[in-house]
Swiss-Prot record:
Protein's gene: proS
GO molecular function: ATP binding; proline-tRNA ligase activity
Enzyme Commission code(s) on record: 6.1.1.15
Annotated localization: Cytoplasm
UniProt organism field: Saccharolobus islandicus (strain M.16.4 / Kamchatka #3)
Reaction catalysis annotation: tRNA(Pro) + L-proline + ATP = L-prolyl-tRNA(Pro) + AMP + diphosphate
The protein, known as: Proline--tRNA ligase
Gene3D superfamilies linked: Anticodon-binding domain (3.40.50.800), Bira Bifunctional Protein, Domain 2 (3.30.930.10), C-terminal domain of ProRS (3.30.110.30)
SMART domains reported in the protein's UniProt record: ProRS-C_1
Example of a GO biological process term: prolyl-tRNA aminoacylation
InterPro entries: aa-tRNA-synt_IIb, aa-tRNA-synth_II, aa-tRNA-synth_II/BPL/LPL, Anticodon-bd, Anticodon-bd_dom_sf, Pro-tRNA-ligase_IIa, Pro-tRNA-ligase_IIa_arc-type, Pro-tRNA_ligase_II_C
Biological role: Catalyzes the attachment of proline to tRNA(Pro) in a two-step reaction: proline is first activated by ATP to form Pro-AMP and then transferred to the acceptor end of tRNA(Pro).
Amino acid sequence: MQITREKWSKNFSEWFDWVLREGEFYDYGRYPVKGMGVWMPYGFKLRQNIISIIRNLLDSTGHEEVLFPLLIPEDLLSRESTHIKGFEEEVFWVTKGGSEDLDVKLALRPTSEVAITTMENLWLKSYKQLPKKYYQIVSVFRYETKATRPMIRLREITTFKEAHTVHETYDDAQRQVEEAIEIYKKIFNNLTIPYVLSERPEWDRFAGALHTYAFDTIMPDGKVMQIGTVHHLGQNFSRALDFKIQKKDGSLDYPHQTSYGISDRAIASVIAIHGDDHGPILPPSVAPIKVVVVPIPAKNEEGTQQVMKYSIEICEMLNKNNITCVTDQDTEKTPGEKFYIWEIKGVPIRLEIGPRELASSTVFIKRRDNLKSYTVKKEEVVNKVKEVLNEIQEDLRKRAWESLKSRIEYANDIEKAKNILENNSGIVEVPWCGSKECGLKIEELTNARVLGYPIEDRKVNDKCVICKMNAKTVLRVAKTY
């Protein structure tokens, strides 16, 4: 087996569909509602492992988990006018209860800022109760009219982590935004997902937000995908819902809020970013199975049974040391067929055990990521597997970051930017004066989408690619999902 990435990069959409189906992650396109898929047991375990990382980081930073109803009354959803305007074309509506028309239409939640603020208004009365940080991991529904894609563009987003926080002052809320960004950096670091962090321009902020900060990553085909957002909401939602708290000086005022979300797209990135033509390469931090043992049959039945017994023993040693391991005991498939199955599931390490390993009390270790192999003694296998899993985690992270950085280019000419995007994709940074007019023109002329600008100060000794005035920063542009 050689490492090739032809299908993975040039036919990514087909590759991704094939992996989800054959790897038994996610069954998409066969459930009889467009834009909704089914998590299969193996994929669901990957999802659980990723959620566990997210949940642990939120819990450890003072966030409290809640669970809100799925339905939101129309009159409530419309209280924040900018917000509903941003979502009105995407809302699923419940209009009947049984055979009776409902007096008030009910929305399947597209997001929960309004619903959660409504209850915070009842729960929180004083600055002494702040800051307050809630989160939930739920399904949200968006009536996508564009072509839907498994995990990437869905009508039911099944893994929507949304956090909502309340603060006394604008500055307190801004500090929470900074904390949220750091939490997301840790999440994506654990998932070995590289990213670009940008502030979205004013015309592309979350509906009702003062500021939106977004994490974007580059997929194998060069298109960019948003994987997480953080919003400073200011007093927009508290004001719209007449939510006030008593401040330290005794006066009443609207509190400041933030919200931040991660969705199924983070899981899609984990599956996609480290792949090759044989399937995904899952980071050990979240792989449902970290090690698979494939017994190699002997020439006779007795020898084969002894190999199987030894294989099971090795696997049990690993499981006792908290290394998730399975032994492939299928007697009808050849070793080659088994290799194919476990490669498409992205299992980081394969152990091959045959008569030779049995006779010498050794184990043959094969890495999924770079195909390196090792033969170790039985008593060394646990420590060696731990060492190799750590190496795989770091190597995947390093390679992904190197790949992302290599696909970010600078262009001080609009035609050059357009050519890069048409031929290489990735992200192009162009000098920008900061005006909306020039930003929209950049989008139009490149036939791409503006991602935003760096949140850190970026000195640019160049002219805006549109108006030729001095540039204030760079604007990031990309082909996106």
